[in-house]
Amino acid sequence: MRARRLVMLRHGQTDYNVGSRMQGQLDTELSELGRTQAVAAAEVLGKRQPLLIVSSDLRRAYDTAVKLGERTGLVVRVDTRLRETHLGDWQGLTHAQIDADAPGARLAWREDATWAPHGGESRVDVAARSRPLVAELVASEPEWGGADEPDRPVVLVAHGGLIAALSAALLKLPVANWPALGGMGNASWTQLSGHWAPGSDFESIRWRLDVWNASAQVSSDVL
């Protein structure tokens, strides 16, 4: 058996994170601390010698990815399927505003991966659009998990909601258990290993969770 290492890095801090405001697919920028966090994460993950870096096109993720690209000399690929969950009517609102307008709705959203805000996506929707990207990378990157340099990871730079949804889908968790994967801090990362035998197809890969919410900087920003 061989293993493909998949690292998923959340973007650095934004002012929306600080203000407990829902971003979704709004194109927000990194804060000054967020840029510092991105550099720190790049320093740690750069030592892993990533095979490639693929990022969401939203600026907070892309700018985080660029720091890792600068550290490793890799050009960052962009894929819109790595965008954060679209939060519909909630985008731009604070947690307090949502709780006042719809008491209990945020709890329902966190506890049910099939639930979506009006006009938005559920975690199941997010996994359905992002999982095919991983399948495409498996098919197109023969060096990933190969015998020569088996531990070089593919790094996806994205968003907390997407990372949780994609991880749950790859791990084939029952949908009712998806909320067990909690929040991630800014510029923190997760690693999954996809165990496979030569000649096997994507559906035969057995993904295992190696690391959840690792960080180059200890912080209390898990939202």
UniProtKB/Swiss-Prot annotation:
GO terms for cellular component: cytoplasm. Pfam families: His_Phos_1. Keywords: Hydrolase, Isopeptide bond, Ubl conjugation. Changing residue 11 to A: Almost completely abolished phosphatase activity. GO terms for molecular function: mannosyl-3-phosphoglycerate phosphatase activity; phosphatase activity. It comes from the Bacteria. Optimum temperature is 45 degrees Celsius. Is active between 20 and 50 degrees Celsius. It catalyses: (2R)-2-O-(alpha-D-glucopyranosyl)-3-phospho-glycerate + H2O = (2R)-2-O-(alpha-D-glucopyranosyl)-glycerate + phosphate; 2-O-(alpha-D-mannosyl)-3-phosphoglycerate + H2O = (2R)-2-O-(alpha-D-mannosyl)-glycerate + phosphate; (2R)-2-O-[alpha-D-mannopyranosyl-(1->2)-alpha-D-glucopyranosyl]-3-phospho-glycerate + H2O = (2R)-2-O-[alpha-D-mannopyranosyl-(1->2)-alpha-D-glucopyranosyl]-glycerate + phosphate. Optimum pH is 7 (at 37 degrees Celsius). Is active between pH 4.0 and 10.0. Transmembrane segments: none annotated. Substrate binds at residues 10, 60, 159. It is an enzyme of class 3 (hydrolase). GO terms for biological process: dephosphorylation. The keyword Ubl conjugation applies. The active site is at residues 11, 84. Its EC number is 3.1.3.85, 3.1.3.70. Progressively inhibited by cobalt ions at concentrations between 10-50 mM and by copper ions at any concentration between 1-50 mM. InterPro entries: His_Pase_superF_clade-1, His_PPase_superfam, PG/BPGM_mutase_AS, PGM_Phosphatase. There is a cross-link at residue 47 (Isoglutamyl lysine isopeptide (Lys-Gln) (interchain with Q-Cter in protein Pup)). Involved in the biosynthesis of mycobacterial methylglucose lipopolysaccharides (MGLPs). Catalyzes the dephosphorylation of glucosyl-3-phosphoglycerate (GPG) to glucosylglycerate (GG). GPG is the preferred substrate, but GpgP also exhibits low dephosphorylation activity on mannosyl-3-phosphoglycerate (MPG) and mannosylglucosyl-3-phosphoglycerate (MGPG) in vitro. Shows only trace of phosphoglycerate mutase (PGM) activity. Belongs to the phosphoglycerate mutase family. Homodimer. Dimerization of the enzyme is essential for its dephosphorylation activity. This is Glucosyl-3-phosphoglycerate phosphatase. The gene is gpgP.
